[in-house]
Amino acid sequence: IRQIAVHRFRLKSFLCFVLITNFVAKIKNKRLSMKIEQQLQAAVIEAVKALYGQDITPEQVALQKTKKEFEGHLTLVVFGLLRISRKKPEDTAQEIGQWLKDNTSLLQSFNVVKGFLNLVIAPTQWITLLNDIDADDHFGITKPTEDSPLVMIEYSSPNTNKPLHLGHVRNNLLGWALAGVVEANGNRVVKTNIVNDRGIHICKSMLAWLKYGNGETPQSSGKKGDHLIGDYYVAFDKHYRAEVKELQAKFMAEGMNEEDAKAKAEKESPLMQEAHAMLVKWEANDPEVRALWRKMNEWVYEGFDETYKALGVSFDKIYYESDTYLVGKQAVEEGLSKGLFFRKEDGSVWADLTKDGLDEKLLLRADGTSVYMTQDIGTAKLRFQDFPINKMIYVVGNEQNYHFQVLSILLDRLGFEWGKSLVHFSYGMVELPNGKMKSREGTVVDADDLVAGMIAQARQTIDEAKKNTDMSEEEKQEVARIVGMGALKYFLLKVDARKNMLFNPEESIDFNGNTGPFIQYTYARIRSILRKAVDAGINVPDTLPTDIEISTKEEEIIQHIADFAAVVRQAGKEYQPAAVANYCYELVKEYNQFYHDFSILREEDSRKQMFRLVLSKNVAKVVRLGMGLLGIEMPERM
């Protein structure tokens, strides 16, 4: 029995030794895929346990980047730990710093400034971190699984009475980029579009085409279908304005004041009355009206498809208002029967939202026709029937803030439990130097013209540079497309989405400063360096030795690369694609300074040379991943 007890004791001692040895190895030597901050966080938790005998959570470890005026990479703020240590801030910081220095290989040194523990990370840790990043082709990206939350994102939402314009371009690019960062945070994403293919605005184009079109088609005119229909929307407005002006003058001649005369003229305009009559016929399923509507919409869809392809956006599911508005009308009628809404004397149906601090909201007109709110209720209901959505995000301009506030309340009132969880990704308007865009006046920046102009401007810049003269014509045009579209996308995405912005094409195509072409040029430069290294027979190992001597600037770049994962998380959490855009710019700006100050291919120390090649390779990788989330392509050559 005594021998068995001795053996058991020895076995327990051995197991304890193994566990302790493994723990120390894990803290000291093991290469971890975690960022250094996460490793330090785990080590601080262990230090507090060892020093003060208490467990703390990761949230209690307050790490931040060290301010530039102090020595260090990361700073631990210890004030939140004083109740545990029961010591002065300086003493607590000193003890934790010394424990980390003695028990881990993370630190080269540390210093204490009051309650701030400034940590200088050991150079070996930076190279270990770079090796981990280098081994991960999708660093910073969390791929969704079958069980991941499902997020639906609606963007684009065009009307079929006009082509897409600059405002639509910002919407589409924001929607695509938002989908990218949300998916990169481990969510399944369904990209969706609601096409406003019915309503009075559609009838205006249809009526104008009947009156003034003479059977014109996209084929006979040589125009894209969306542009052709847009011309007739403008034509309707032109004739309507002339009609109103004539009627207003008539009513004023009869003694009516200017304001009342204009209101009466707009109401009694024969052209507008015909458009409303056509809308009523459409909702009554009139065969002739429906046939014309289908024909003209098909022209528009073909045009839209070309524009979407040029912008590099697509959708997983497209809804059409003509399919959803009846579902919305039915939901409103059911709400009316339950006393949730009320009918006015003229027959229109309204929602009283005064108890919610809002006003009354029209849901059905007196003639029974629906409004945008009716359609959105129906579309939301269909979407949640079609998909097990965990979250619904609408990418719509900030002029619709009130609309989505009301939609959320109405859906909740109708008993749809997901109503209050809707997210309105509200963004600012794109303005021109001469003011806002108005499609009814034909004074818009057309999306197709904008895309063509950006590509042409990029091509001109490339030709003037007279570089890569060995490129074929096809290659030059492809680079021009990538650069032109990159300039457009980056310029629109780098700005906080909530802000209004002024679009300047010339500024966006600049190869210097905070622009897409500047980032693309840096990427192409790195790819060129890597190709030259291969041609020169320079071999780079899969794993860098950790004892290579590196500079402070190189440490900073590794830290900047490692920040990518946190930036992606922030962008997904806060719905801010601009965070990724500006991160990419700051990274390439820092790399360009490094490129200016340090030799790479001409470096005589082979160990430093291979380190800098791996560093450059991973700058390019992270930039490609980040810009890819935004829908921006990277050229291999420029």
What are these model-predicted stretches?
Residues 135-146:
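Flexible, low-complexity linker/hinge segments
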Residues 3, 12, 26-28:
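Charged/polar low-complexity intrinsically disordered segments
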Residues 1-7:
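Short alpha-helix boundary/capping segments
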Residues 128-133:
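Short, charged, solvent-exposed linker or helix-capping segments at domain edges/interfaces
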Residues 22, 33-127, 145-638:
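Non-catalytic interaction-recognition regions
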